[in-house]
Amino acid sequence: GGNRITPHFGIEALNRDGEVEETFSYPVQEGIVSEETSATMRYILEMVVSEGSGRNGQVQGFRVGGKTATSQTLPRGSGRYISSFIGFAPADDPQVIAIAIINNPQGVYYGGQVAAPIIRQLYENILPYLGLEKTEDTVVENH
């Protein structure tokens, strides 16, 4: 199901000799979303990447879920936008989440066109680095 995990950037503090000085712990609040709801949301967000506006976030051999966003900044009519894409992979067992936010992109300004390719490039490098195996399945079955 869904667990709330505190975002964090480190798990240990090391001294100059590389020995652990402190191990950080982060609270996990369990059961905030049912397993069924979590699976449904993963499926919907995976479809955004496989068939929708997030297609530029697809990574060959990996299942990726995500959401694009495009917003106009004030004042309205200024022609200024914020484009973004948040993605997670592998979609069936998320290990990595990343977001790209582009403030006032030039030319094309849609999140799926501007920000999703950034996450794709990141995942093309980081997923193999993490030792995650490619899959033949590109999309999970509907629940």
Residue ranges and their predicted role:
Residues 133-143:
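Short, highly charged C-terminal tails/helix-capping segments
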Residues 1-29, 36, 45-131:
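Active-site beta-strand/loop architecture of penicillin-binding DD-peptidases
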